[in-house]
Amino acid sequence: MPKRTDIHKIMVIGSGPIIIGQAAEFDYSGTQACLALKEEGYETVLVNSNPATIMTDKGIADHVYIEPLTVAALTRILRQEAPDVLLPTLGGQIGLNLAVALSKTGILDELGIELLGTKLASIDQAEDREKFKELMQELGEPVPASLTVSTVEQALAFAKTVGYPVIVRPAFTMGGTGGGLANNEAELAEIAKNGLELSPATQCLIEKSIAGYKEIEFEVMRDAADNTMVVCCMENFDPVGIHTGDSIVFAPSQTLADREYQRLRDCALKLISALKIEGGCNVQLALDPNSYDYNVIEVNPRVSRSSALASKATGYPIAKLAAKIAVGLTLDEIKNPVTKTTYAEFEPALDYVVVKIPRWPFDKFTKADRRLGSQMKATGEVMAIGRTAEEALLKAVASLEIDQKDLLSKEAAAASDRQLEDKLVHAQDDRLFYIAEAFRRGYSLADLHELTRINHYFLDIVAGLVEEEGRIKAAGLDKEVIYEAKRDGFADTTLATLLGQNPAAIRAFRKANGIVPVYKMVDTCAAEFDSATPYFYSTYETENESRRSAKPSVLVIGSGPIRIGQGVEFDYATVHCVRALQKLGYEAIVINSNPETVSTDFSVSDKLYFEPLTLENVLNVTDLEQPVGAIVQFGGQTAINLASGLEANGVKILGTTVADLDAAEDRELFDQVIKDLNLRQPIGMTATTRQGVLDAAKEIGYPVLVRPSYVLGGKAMEIVYGQAELEDYLNQNADVTGSHPILVDAYLEGAECEVDAICDGERVLLPGIMEHIEHAGVHSGDSMAVYPPQSLSGAVKVQIEEATKKLAVALKCVGIMNIQFIIHDGQAYVLEVNPRASRTVPFLSKVTGIEMAQLATKVILGHSLAEQGYRSGLAPESQMIHVKAPVFSFSKLGDVDSYLGPEMKSTGEVMGSDTTYEKALYKAFAGAGMEVPDNGAVLLTIEDNDKAQILPLAKRFLAIGYRILATSGTAAFLEENGLHPTVVAKLHEQGQPAILDVIKDKHVDLVINTMGHDDEKNSDGFIIRQTAIEHHVPLLTALDTVNALLRSLEMTSFKTTEL
């Protein structure tokens, strides 16, 4: 069936900001789809609120709108652009929910706009829990005993009839949002209440738990002619009960007998046909490990996290082909872009094993609830490819970029047997390492299966690797044993630990004995057909399939898994670096480990190596490719941390040298540069002992900002107000040594701002200055920011410009750098310098029109700013106002304090742009999901330090028609100043109304809580904030953000004043 000619203009809905459950995979799939539609000759319109994406670059679609993903904003764009069709299945759950909401408003019927790909009825049938269950019964497909409920009482009554445990699955949500496993009545009441509040349809499925079954996923495709095919079958290491986004996943499936596979495959294809889905779809099934019985868990009628993983695991570009199917093409008409000879209807075949491990944020959130269940908690994931399951598993662990590089865990080794068993029964993010430790202690396969319900096959893989550790220790540096260990995925660092050597000695021994990796191609067909994919993974075999090109090449080091502090912004910069290299005639080689991103789309670079970002793996690639050099400026701290090891092994670091990178990161060297240039910075000291930290704080005077050197995302950074608090900080971050010093700075009050600068060694270009809306002390990644600045004087801008120029030249920056300033008493103080691309690159590139990463790449390769047509200094400011707002995922992470401070907590960002600051703010708040009505009620719980500031804000709330509720101390202060708030009883006070009831019963529309820096779980401020998050009441903890919100609300409200 040829493509449709009755449609010309297609509008695509993007997925919005990165949150837990919906990450960079949608940037990858949306970018692929937009380009595929353009390739077919259609005019495309894209709407997305996330500026940190390749998808929102000019040129990916014909018309790009960075606007809030709300019904109101989309309706305006639909009227303006009048597309023929709307494609919602590439925008994750947000895209689907918006399609349903737009349809209900009648705008699609009014404008005659058709839904492309999957029809509304199919979306509804797959997402509405009751309709889906009815369809399964019609098809004769088994589902767990369940009931769709719209009240907590119905949930409790059903659970009584089927017995506990039960699983709660809210309708129309993603990442298991609001769901969970309930073991008793109290747990069910709490989870069901939360799930009903979070479901757009106020609907939950209560399901008899089948926890312990094998969890199997099929990625399937279907076209309009009802051709269906399986792209990939994946099997979870963890049994049913843990969200698939929080599970280790193997592809292809490892433990299914042929009969089981065929039954489940038939079921998956039957479902996609019955739902009439056109495009890609994810089917989740549960298989009883003791029989052939299975249950259908759910169907996602859209591209998803799993489809991005399946695309990278197989090389089969699901989103690209789903977009082509949506416009009428069939699987037997579309050429497979990998082989270029076979058609898309051929099912991929794998002659390797892929392992995905989630990347959790618990290294940032040390007090978070780490237990895993049916609600997803991971921010990102890594993928590794090997010839065997063992090799792929160990490579995936090495890719995580956590303190744990292999299965040798110090924490697990130190646990008592009782603690160990508790960790095995109650799954957390680190359970794999405790399984390995249990085998070291002599636990049997049967013991561990009983404790974990994990399949014997997967446990046997871990047991085999633990046995091999023993053989390696016993044999010493033996050529045969080392070769076998490398084939099984053991890293040089692990072998060094086991043998009491250093990794360099292991590498030297390997090379001397010819134990070096070869690279195999990912070709979708297990080498059955000719293929020329430039997509490789390493293994220890004989034939090498990667050939060095005669063209000069440059290696670009990616940024690894998405995590808090290092998000999709760095992947954006990596992709632009690749584009610039290709324009300059170089072969661009990417090494990365993240399956969700655009940079690991093999069609982006000239060569892609899917490998852990460790020194060993990067050096193996440079040994083979012999690049001109490596670029580390765009891969975040991951790439910067590899620079000195690469240089020590003879790899040229292009751009700013390693010595100059160190000068910016090393406190004493940097302080000397500041002094030499006569610039201002807050008083600061470096301490290498616990007592040294305490002495430094005393000398500088409290409050002080304390942090370790060499960190990203403000990890372990805190504002400390007194000695007792500082001692608590040191107890939690006790690793203070000469190689791990602690920095102690005076904490200055003032406005923060930052610049990204590009320097060619002589000239320095500042594309723009971004002013932070929150006060100093809130991490720059969590602060709202505005460009151009709204309150900086001309004189301050000149100070910033001059300081940036001096620093860039003095630090011998060649490429890109980021500098943060604080404006205190009209003077600009330098806070910190990052000699690399920062998370602001995509935002500033979009709003200034200067493609910063491309410009910096050309500078790195010797093309001066003058040559590229740029002058030194601050670029002219734009006429439009642009506001960047952070987006958080607190509702997914229990026990994480939402109080904003110097440690970064946001997972994503949105942008609002308009002709005035107030309108841009309004859009940014709308994009971030801060839905506050024009009038209502606001609850104030304010720390004493902030009371003077709250008074004018409270008066402004009254002026626009808000009622004010406040706790006793805040209320007394407001009364003294002529305002009459309603007093609410604090947590430990008698009286009505009680503060938590006011929040739980939604008697307030906004909570403003600045009850500070004490983040102990039982502190009043923490409990109030958690209650607001759990009940989805908008919450603000910084008064500067409140001021910004008021400005946006005041813009939409009319004053009523008497004559």
From Swiss-Prot:
Q: Where is this region: Allosteric domain?
A: 930-1059
Give the molecular function GO annotations.
ATP binding; carbamoyl-phosphate synthase (ammonia) activity; carbamoyl-phosphate synthase (glutamine-hydrolyzing) activity; metal ion binding
Which residues does the record give as Mn(2+) 2 binding sites?
E298, N300
Top-rank taxon of the source lineage equals Bacteria
Q: Which residues form the ATP-grasp domain?
A: 133-327, 671-861
Q: Which residues bind Mg(2+) 2?
A: E298, N300
- The MGS-like domain sits at 930-1059
Residue positions binding ATP 2: R707, A746, L748, E752, G777, V778, H779, S780, Q820, E832
Which keywords does this Swiss-Prot/TrEMBL entry list?
A: Amino-acid biosynthesis, Arginine biosynthesis, ATP-binding, Ligase, Magnesium, Manganese, Metal-binding, Nucleotide-binding, Pyrimidine biosynthesis, Repeat
Listed binding positions for Mg(2+) 3 are Q820, E832
GO biological process entries = 'de novo' UMP biosynthetic process; glutamine metabolic process; L-arginine biosynthetic process
Q: Specify which residues bind Mg(2+) 1 according to the UniProt entry for this protein.
A: Q284, E298
User: What protein family is recorded?
Assistant: Belongs to the CarB family.
Question: What does the entry's domain section say?
Answer: The large subunit is composed of 2 ATP-grasp domains that are involved in binding the 2 ATP molecules needed for carbamoyl phosphate synthesis. The N-terminal ATP-grasp domain (referred to as the carboxyphosphate synthetic component) catalyzes the ATP-dependent phosphorylation of hydrogencarbonate to carboxyphosphate and the subsequent nucleophilic attack by ammonia to form a carbamate intermediate.
Q: What is this protein called?
A: Carbamoyl phosphate synthase large chain
Species this chain originates from: Limosilactobacillus fermentum (strain NBRC 3956 / LMG 18251)
Organism lineage: Bacteria, Bacillati, Bacillota, Bacilli, Lactobacillales
